[in-house]
């Protein structure tokens, strides 16, 4: 499902643990490409339903394993580098994304990268809030910055209320 401007609707997933760290996963393929889980929204699927489907497919978590803390207001877009643009119709020039900030309420042992085949990721780490900006592939960097910036007040408010005054993490 590509929109009239050539952007594919997609959800991005920022998953935090109780220490405020974010799940950062390495894509299968040996290029040392790390990113947040993300995936396309199917025809007639809501962004929220796509969120839970992608969460299960990519990291093996279900709705009961997470709590939604926030979501970006509008669509955040990025353009693909020319070498990755699909020229056949419908032409896809990039992604437009709704980003969700989730808190893991289960133990991190519930995270399973082999939940679907083929796997999207081969390993993962917990990282600090702003760490991904220096590591994500360049063409996604601006959308990551915008998503993290927009969701940082929600993130800070959650951790201020749970960790105490003066303990904001970003």
UniProtKB/Swiss-Prot annotation:
Gene Ontology terms, MF aspect: pyrophosphatase activity
UniProt keyword annotations, A-Z: Hydrolase
SUPFAM superfamilies named in the record: Nudix (SSF55811)
Keyword check for Secreted: no
Family: Belongs to the Nudix hydrolase family. RppH subfamily.
Protein task: Accelerates the degradation of transcripts by removing pyrophosphate from the 5'-end of triphosphorylated RNA, leading to a more labile monophosphorylated state that can stimulate subsequent ribonuclease cleavage.
Protein name: RNA pyrophosphohydrolase
Organism: Saccharophagus degradans (strain 2-40 / ATCC 43961 / DSM 17024)
Gene name tied to this protein: rppH
